[in-house]
Amino acid sequence: MSQILDTILLFSLPASGKSEVRRYLASLTPEQCRNDFHLGPTLQLDDYPYVHLMHRLDDELKAHGLGYAYYHGPNRPFRDNWTWAVLIELLNEDHANLMASRQVEVASAAQHLMDRLDAAHAKVGLAQPMGDLPHRLRLKVAQALEAECRRELDALNRQNAQDKTGRTLVIEAARGGAHGSAFPLCPPHGYETAFQTLSPVILERAAVLYVWVDPAESRRKNLERGRPDGQGSILHHSVPMEVMLGQYGCDDMGWLMEQSDRPGTVRIERITSQNNAYSTKVYHLPVARFDNRGDLTTFVRTDEALWQPAAVEALHAGLKAAFDSLAG
């Protein structure tokens, strides 16, 4: 039997094809995934739902006469760039709950999300705006978001309850830096900060599948995929252009690969403390590029019945080469 990959960090710029890759994998039989891609049946974690729900919280705060808590505006970047690290802390928590098969049972999913957001902000040294809301206003905001938050929490709970034996976890995220930035990117931008924030439990089990597209192509596809009513959708949301240029104008994955002392890996140095002393822990995560500069993935957004065999074959072959590299 081929080696089953434990955890895949599915990373790339927005609209590069990450979600389409996930959808394509979901269309395959377990035998195809195992034999061609070294994958067990997949479990999925993604930080985009939190990006969307923070926008929704800001919408409700504005509707009640308050300022935005998380963003400079509905189509603008985060108020504090360290919110990128907040998203990783939320993924760390989701991962811990998944591995523990934990069922999160709360009276209000929206109130629970507010508490989680504040706790994650505190971990990276940011203010906790939801805790400062007047009680009656917080109840109104929670009521407006309860249905959306409940859907997300229920989905996580359903996944947490599943048997993890022989499964592959796929964690999806996009990171980058401003157009024209020099490397290394300054924290908290880029994948370097994401790797510095991810739980060691994840790093010890993970490999990186990097979906490679040019930033200009990422911007084009971002506009192409967007739908005005699709901001809550993984496949059809669109990132504002200010964010695309200011936060995703480049990324540092290629640079990190070049800096590694082991070919085919990214090297991550983490400072740890033990016995009242600091030391360095080094991780070498296997990494493979799936070259999507020729756009092998857009067709996956359409109905599966419309997929053309030649397009499927090209996508399958490209992914197989990348996963074979990760499996060694």
Give a label for each model feature.
Residues 1-328:
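Glycine-rich phosphate-binding loop of ATP-dependent small-molecule kinases
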